[in-house]
């Protein structure tokens, strides 16, 4: 189940607000300029789908986003617990960073935790299958896929070069809960 937990950005351990209600999550995030929607990830992809199979199955969703915002490229990120690079990738994504473009993800299976540092708050968004999130360009954030990751998401880009991060050097991510 998707969830949003909001913390103060001073490392406070007590949440300011929490919900698993999709409408409440959307309202909170939209107020911060973050797009959050529940889409339908209802295609049978099998146990370990290829990126090509995922893109073919969800081309209709990609086409909607491209028509709406003019995105130029897309790919699939898929991570499983048996991936030999999981620890290195988790460490990379756990560092606070920004992008020069919106970070758009449509989760078609599994889950991951987007942590958005907006103003004086940290918004932890547990995204699961069916969730579409678009983090605005320039928003400091990090992503936790957990120690035993299992997710597949379609990534949509303005930049044909794909995922390019600008790391902030802030240790803030170390102060907040992570996925197990």
Curated annotation (Swiss-Prot):
Positions bearing the site annotation: May play a role in transmitting local conformational changes: 102
CDD domains in alphabetical order: cupin_ARD
Keywords for the protein's UniProt record, in alphabetical order: Amino-acid biosynthesis, Dioxygenase, Iron, Metal-binding, Methionine biosynthesis, Nickel, Oxidoreductase
Protein's UniProt keywords contain Iron: yes
Gene Ontology molecular-function annotations: acireductone dioxygenase (Ni2+-requiring) activity; acireductone dioxygenase [iron(II)-requiring] activity; iron ion binding; nickel cation binding
Pathway where it operates: Amino-acid biosynthesis; L-methionine biosynthesis via salvage pathway; L-methionine from S-methyl-5-thio-alpha-D-ribose 1-phosphate: step 5/6
Site residues (May play a role in metal incorporation in vivo), renumbered to this chain: 96
Catalytic reaction equation(s): 1,2-dihydroxy-5-(methylsulfanyl)pent-1-en-3-one + O2 = 3-(methylsulfanyl)propanoate + CO + formate + 2 H(+); 1,2-dihydroxy-5-(methylsulfanyl)pent-1-en-3-one + O2 = 4-methylsulfanyl-2-oxobutanoate + formate + 2 H(+)
Broad class of enzyme this protein falls into: oxidoreductase
Pfam families documented for this protein: ARD
Coiled coil: none
Annotated site, Important to generate the dianion, chain positions: 105
Gene3D superfamilies in alphabetical order: Jelly Rolls
Residues that coordinate or bind Ni(2+): 97, 99, 103, 141
Binding site for Fe(2+): 97, 99, 103, 141
Single GO biological process annotation from the record: L-methionine salvage from S-adenosylmethionine
EC numbers: 1.13.11.54, 1.13.11.53
Record text on cofactor binding: Binds 1 Fe(2+) cation per monomer.
Function description: Catalyzes 2 different reactions between oxygen and the acireductone 1,2-dihydroxy-3-keto-5-methylthiopentene (DHK-MTPene) depending upon the metal bound in the active site. Fe-containing acireductone dioxygenase (Fe-ARD) produces formate and 2-keto-4-methylthiobutyrate (KMTB), the alpha-ketoacid precursor of methionine in the methionine recycle pathway. Ni-containing acireductone dioxygenase (Ni-ARD) produces methylthiopropionate, carbon monoxide and formate, and does not lie on the methionine recycle pathway.
Similarity comment text for this entry: Belongs to the acireductone dioxygenase (ARD) family.
Quaternary assembly: Monomer.
PANTHER family, alphabetized: ACIREDUCTONE DIOXYGENASE
Name of the featured protein: Acireductone dioxygenase
Organism of derivation: Cronobacter sakazakii
Top-level taxonomy: Bacteria, Pseudomonadati, Pseudomonadota, Gammaproteobacteria, Enterobacterales
């Amino acid at each position: 189940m998707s969830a949003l937990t909001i913390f103060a950005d001073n490392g406070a351990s007590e949440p300011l607000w929490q919900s698993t209600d999709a409408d409440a999550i959307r309202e909170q995030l939209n107020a911060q300029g973050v797009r959050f929607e529940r889409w339908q990830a209802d295609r049978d992809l099998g146990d370990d789908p290829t990126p090509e199979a995922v893109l073919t199955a969800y081309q209709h969703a990609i086409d909607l986003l491209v028509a709406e915002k003019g995105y130029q490229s897309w790919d699939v990120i898929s991570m499983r617990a048996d991936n030999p690079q999981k620890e290195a990738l988790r460490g990379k994504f756990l560092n606070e960073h920004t992008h020069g473009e919106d970070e758009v993800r449509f989760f078609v299976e599994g889950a991951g935790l987007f942590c958005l540092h907006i103003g004086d708050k940290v918004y932890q968004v547990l995204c699961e299958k069916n969730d579409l999130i678009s983090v605005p360009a320039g928003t400091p954030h990090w992503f936790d896929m957990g120690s035993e990751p299992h997710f597949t998401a379609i990534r949509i880009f303005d930049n044909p070069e794909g995922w390019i991060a600008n790391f902030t050097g802030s240790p803030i991510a170390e102060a907040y809960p992570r996925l197990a």
